[in-house]
């Protein structure tokens, strides 16, 4: 496959879900083999140029996995999502999600952003099912114009997988003074709800001051976990419950402005730390502030008899721009 080109447009058109914008006869006559439409969205925010940017590529059935990865690297966002024809009859689209480092079975802000993009082109609030490698995700979407809100039910409930890296190594990797990372009830652990992260608690000031040390990061043994979520209770009056930062340079994401999949696993870490009793929870997680891209992620879940019964992740998304991705064979 040859070069990839991305062409922007001044207006954001409304597209049919999973539809290639160039029909087969046009492709046969053109030296450009394929032309696909894309939109960019800022997710977990209701205003442009905040939250986590996302590229949504429509009609991606014609793309190989290698082409998807190359396009993702061209956009150079934390993630891009590709919409394909679903295999399951009850699903409106099938999603493939890529970071610059490779494909993920699930991620939060691409799921929210894809649902918002589909609902916007349909011009109506909707309930839909999206097909991902990590399962079928039921999503409720509401909004109008360019601003939408989506919340998905995660079929993968939070769980603790293993203990985390040594606190001293985490402190070195995140540029924190010795003693910053909690080592008792909030000791580092590997948790996940679809994909795994390592979770580490620190005082709020330390979370805000963390700076990635790539040399020390390379000494961490993260296996196939996607990154480290550093967390603390949010400041009073912030309107949030938790203040977090997610670092994942080994997957091509030095720091992520908003990580719905990491927020989804946070309840498992809090339960293992003795923080959760039975009941219904409705959290707001703030992220991206240190990057100048403030984001808010809603995490709703229920605990019964010490077990997670449900989990939903939600947030706003706003359309930013649109255009075409073109490449020649």
Sequence positions of predicted segments:
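Active-site proximal loop and beta-alpha junction motif in alpha/beta enzyme cores
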Residues: 7, 23, 27-106, 112-329
């Amino acid at each position: 496959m040859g070069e990839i080109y991305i062409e922007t447009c001044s207006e954001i058109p409304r597209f049919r879900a999973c539809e290639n914008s160039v029909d087969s006869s046009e492709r046969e006559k053109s030296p450009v083999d394929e032309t696909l439409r894309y939109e960019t969205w800022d997710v977990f925010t209701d205003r442009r140029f905040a939250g986590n940017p996302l590229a949504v590529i429509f009609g991606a059935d014609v793309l190989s996995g290698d082409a998807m990865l190359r396009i993702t690297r061209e956009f150079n966002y934390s993630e891009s999502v590709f919409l394909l024809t679903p295999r399951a009859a009850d699903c409106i689209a099938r999603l493939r999600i890529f970071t610059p480092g490779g494909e993920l079975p699930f991620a939060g802000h691409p799921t929210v952003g894809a649902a918002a993009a589909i609902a916007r082109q349909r011009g109506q609030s909707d309930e839909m099912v999206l097909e991902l490698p990590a399962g079928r995700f039921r999503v409720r979407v509401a909004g109008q114009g360019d601003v939408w809100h989506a919340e998905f039910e995660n079929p993968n409930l939070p769980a603790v997988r293993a203990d985390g890296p040594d606190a001293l190594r985490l402190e070195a990797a995140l540029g924190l003074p010795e003693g910053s990372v909690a080592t008792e009830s909030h000791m580092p652990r590997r948790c996940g709800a679809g994909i795994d992260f390592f979770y580490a608690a620190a005082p709020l000031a330390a979370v805000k001051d963390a700076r990635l040390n790539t040399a020390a990061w390379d000494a961490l043994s993260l296996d196939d976990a996607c990154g480290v979520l550093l967390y603390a209770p949010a400041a009073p009056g912030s309107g949030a419950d938790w203040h977090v930062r997610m670092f994942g340079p080994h997957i091509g994401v030095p720091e992520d402005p908003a990580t719905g999949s990491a927020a989804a696993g946070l309840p498992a870490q809090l339960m293992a730390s003795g923080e959760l009793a039975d009941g219904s929870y409705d959290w707001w997680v703030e992220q991206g502030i240190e990057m100048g891209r403030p984001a808010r992620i809603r995490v709703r879940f229920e605990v019964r008899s010490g077990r997670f019964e449900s989990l939903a992740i939600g947030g706003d998304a706003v359309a930013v721009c649109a255009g075409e991705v073109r490449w020649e064979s």
